[in-house]
């Protein structure tokens, strides 16, 4: 599991930052990539990475402001041109389907794959499979805005090889089935339950993504015990009043969430163009006074998300 920042600017692009997009790479787990918001020129940013558009199977849209969605029509069109694109699901607030369909219709663009739309209305579970579950909750912005919590389900414990050796289980398919927790039958007819040969389950990883919002209790609920929290940081700590007025957060707001909710690593994104160079690094410096595992995200930064412990 890896996370890559394709755009980290707030409102409009700057010389060093494109507008919002995050890629959650689940290649080892699902052979898929999920995008969170698709700002203008996202497909240009993707060209600078190893991401293949056909691997993108799910897109999660936090809200419908232009700097978070204007890249959708172009990306969807290019994904079609490149072929081999399977079904795609877009999760987002009311209006996202209308925006996409209108853009495609007016430009007479036809995509070669089905697009499913899931409208975000209430807090709770929006996706689940055997490996992951995704939850959403309403944030506090000028338009309906949602945060996301991606939860990897617990992983099976390690196979207890010393115990396996006592039963002379041969290498091969039987050992693999035992590791998967299944019941196997040995050549002498003895049955072994794989669950008896596994160590304790290991908790999966949790990634929380918070875009445009004022501080609100829902952020904490989404961020609880997250291995990675990505949080908007439009303003520095001295601009609390301005952040409140414009329905945004400061770097200190993000750091407090991370500190108070047992977060592993905090990444600051959605950075105003006023914070370049030393001013940008100051955001990170100030946030680290509250939560030391804080990182200022830059475009194309790529981080592996490892299992805790």
Curated annotation (Swiss-Prot):
UniProt EC number: 3.1.26.11
A Pfam family assignment: Lactamase_B
Catalytic activity: Endonucleolytic cleavage of RNA, removing extra 3' nucleotides from tRNA precursor, generating 3' termini of tRNAs. A 3'-hydroxy group is left at the tRNA terminus and a 5'-phosphoryl group is left at the trailer molecule
Binding site for Zn(2+) 1: 63, 65, 141, 212
Keywords, sorted A to Z: Endonuclease, Hydrolase, Metal-binding, Nuclease, tRNA processing, Zinc
Residues noted as binding Zn(2+) 2 in the record, renumbered to the chain: 67-68, 212, 270
InterPro entries, A to Z: Metallo-B-lactamas, RibonucZ/Hydroxyglut_hydro, RNase_Z/BN
Active site per UniProt: 67
Obligatory cofactor(s): Zn(2+)
Keyword Hydrolase annotated: yes
Function summary: Zinc phosphodiesterase, which displays some tRNA 3'-processing endonuclease activity. Probably involved in tRNA maturation, by removing a 3'-trailer from precursor tRNA.
Family stated for the protein in its record: Belongs to the RNase Z family.
Entries under HAMAP family matching the protein: RNase_Z_BN (MF_01818)
Assembly, per entry: Homodimer.
Full protein name: Ribonuclease Z
Organism this protein belongs to: Lactobacillus johnsonii (strain CNCM I-12250 / La1 / NCC 533)
Taxonomy of the source species: Bacteria, Bacillati, Bacillota, Bacilli, Lactobacillales
